[in-house]
Amino acid sequence: MTKLRSSLYFWVLVAIALGVILGIVAPSTGAAMKPLGDGFIKLIKMVIAPIIFCTVVLGIAGTGDLKKVGRTGGLALLYFEVVSTVSLILGLLIVNIVRPGAGMNIDVRTLDAAAVSAYAGKGKMQSTSEFLINVIPNTFVDAFARGEILQVLLLAVLFGIALQRLGAHRNEVFQFIEKFSEIMFELVRMIMKVAPIGAFGAMAFTIGAYGIGSLFSLAKLMATFYLTCLCFIFLVLGAIARYHGFSIWRFLRYIREELLIVLGTSSSEAALPRMMAKMESLGAGRSTVGLVIPAGYSFNLDGTSIYLTMAAVFVAQATNSAMTLGEQFTLLAVLLLMSKGAAGVTGSGFIVLAATLSAIGKVPVGGLALILGIDRFMSEARALTNVIGNGVASIVVAKWTGDLDETMLTTRLKSGPPTPAEEPAIMS
């Protein structure tokens, strides 16, 4: 019992339960807890950019093999594209079989379209050239100041290559970045001590602001989406994991604390630093983890992909805006591009969805007002699926590139999650 009370897992679970209770008993007070959740997520986002930079630079400069770095990046992108496409198709397939919006006969004119317009205005269809140009930061500091993960990743790759080319003169800089990285991970450990407070505030706000009642009116869509995410995790990712020699069940058990943090905060970014440390502790090489995990937050959002296809077709069904098979394939193609711009932040999936429907024009954007009230509750499943998908991706790509210690992977997964006493060694 003493061991349980000293674990982060236990206290985050307690905090989530207390947040739910407060949101139900005193909704206005629960809604007022929002700053606690927002503050915790901002603390995490504060250290994401330097951790990604240090991890990637140390990984690239330490390998001495630039061809391997390029191969890792190429294989990661190939994996992301294939698995993201599978998740989009799975969402499209199940929403057409279950048809959660059929028979609702919603008149879009009766909905509050103004509530959706704010989201639609935030997103727009980017061309490939615009996307690539936006990956390049205006200045070295600008990428860190804005917290743009892809920009920081690009800087880190270039910096690591340049440092590796310096030869013997690189040692001083390498050692400095190594020590700085240790400080950043120690800072993450400090921030994680307040994770239960952040989870409590975020959950209390969600229940207090949106209410449990909003779940029942669209229960069929919610149930269909959650079941689809579970199917993806245990069937698709489970099959991928089994093929590559590890159990998805043991993997989920190993990262259970990170999953609870994501569940409580509804943001996959909240677990990014710890996920990078955990994947290294499972035997994946630092350079692989440093490339795959951050890139996955833009290119491998499996939960968001499932949500996008299901929500778009649900709105079409509910508003009687029939979509032909060809139009659904068009939707799929557009979402393959649009989903790459969805960051791992709460609400980003809804913004991308609104922008996609605006670009296609077949489904009324105002129909999204139907799911605006439950989007926050669906965000948890999106974020959890995203985190699990990126974790599996890092192990798979590490194995493909020969950068995985399979003995360590098997041993760590068998022994289960690290104890509180083992945490400092893993996080360093």
From Swiss-Prot:
PROSITE patterns: NA_DICARBOXYL_SYMP_1, NA_DICARBOXYL_SYMP_2. GO terms for biological process: L-aspartate transmembrane transport. The chain crosses the membrane at residues 7-27, 40-60, 75-95, 143-163, 196-216, 221-241, 306-326, 329-349, 351-371. It holds the Pfam family SDF. GO terms for cellular component: plasma membrane. Responsible for the transport of dicarboxylates such as succinate, fumarate, and malate from the periplasm across the membrane. HAMAP family: C4_dicarb_transport. Belongs to the dicarboxylate/amino acid:cation symporter (DAACS) (TC 2.A.23) family. This is C4-dicarboxylate transport protein. The gene is dctA.
